[in-house]
């Protein structure tokens, strides 16, 4: 089955900048997150699709490769998938194509020890952790430098020796018809060195599989889609080459009370209809504790109250966001006989559902309905 275009998956144009890509991903991730759609396999598949698209398009190098080659750019297995807690690093297109053309036209070169692969770790945070910042310990499996041979692959007391086939060049010349071409040495695989006495622990690879524990400091104000780079904490390189990096991908879990939009927080505050009509004070939650909200008389459902500075301070700096409380007027339930009687008396004092003085919107609505039916009968 053909893969969906990454730009279409996120609903953005090919010219979209990083901010637009992040905003689209955040909106879709909140919509299709498994926590919000338990048991929905279609939502889970969609979530994985947009996550994969985001991880490619937010990385400038991967995005450039995708724009040029499409999905074929990642079919060599180098980019890594989107599942699991961690994944492999990016493909080196210079190595993919350079080896082919180098062998044919004599441009082959001694193969240098490969830098270690980058790793990715998906970290879920609560809203409180994302807003305030947190330090978390994570455990990841990775290829680490062998502590016996210190990465050179040779048994202690010995060293890699010069390849007798290519004499350390890493290349050999071969005649093919009228042409003489250079190819990677089949004996040392282009490294110019061979290990005669391999390390007993890593068997000559210079690396061993280990799990390591890292302490990751998450700065205050991060949001879904943000990525934290830990330099040199990826997999160890081959035979002493530099290690790759670890990328911590942030995913903020849905909150039972608050919703975040950029640096602002939103919440719904239920009030009874008596307070809505008469006004009063009510306690509302913030991430810093409870505060009092003054509700004016004759407040209608849906009205937004802004509490300045009670939102999120962005990790990128700037002013702190606000908390916006949306009032929801609740209809009373489980009424006793006395309450029903009082409500009936109140309704009679209003003059019915279309009372002009006490319900101006209802009056306007019923006048509109009457005009509509009058027009139909003409």
UniProtKB/Swiss-Prot annotation:
A zinc finger (CR-type) spans 133-211. The keyword Zinc-finger applies. CXXCXGXG motif repeats lie at residues 146-153, 163-170, 185-192, 199-206. One of its GO terms (molecular function) is ATP binding. The J domain is necessary and sufficient to stimulate DnaK ATPase activity. Zinc center 1 plays an important role in the autonomous, DnaK-independent chaperone activity of DnaJ. Zinc center 2 is essential for interaction with DnaK and for DnaJ activity. Belongs to the DnaJ family. This is Chaperone protein DnaJ. It comes from Pectobacterium carotovorum subsp. carotovorum (strain PC1).
